[in-house]
Amino acid sequence: METIWKFEIKPKDGVIEIMMPIGAEILSTGAIDDSVFVWAKFSTDDDTESEPRYFEVFGTGHNIPVDMGIDRKFIGTAFMHDGSLVWHIFERI
């Protein structure tokens, strides 16, 4: 059996650590009210342990460092306050 959970990501400078079940597949991102979330699917067949996952959030027009030896995977874009705040979520891989 599988399930989907949402995990809150609080936009801030730097890396955001979120504990997720091992092997969780990130499905999408979005905003609800004043919060940004990612949704992830994972198996509930085992007693799945958690692992840290690392995310970064950048606003439109903000600088994204590229010379740090870090690989990032784009997860999605979240719109807040009727689109006046736009966040782009990346996972460090």
Question: Where is each model-derived feature located?
Answer:
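Catalytic phosphate/metal-binding cores of nucleic-acid and nucleotide-processing enzymes, i.e., regions
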Residues: M1-I93
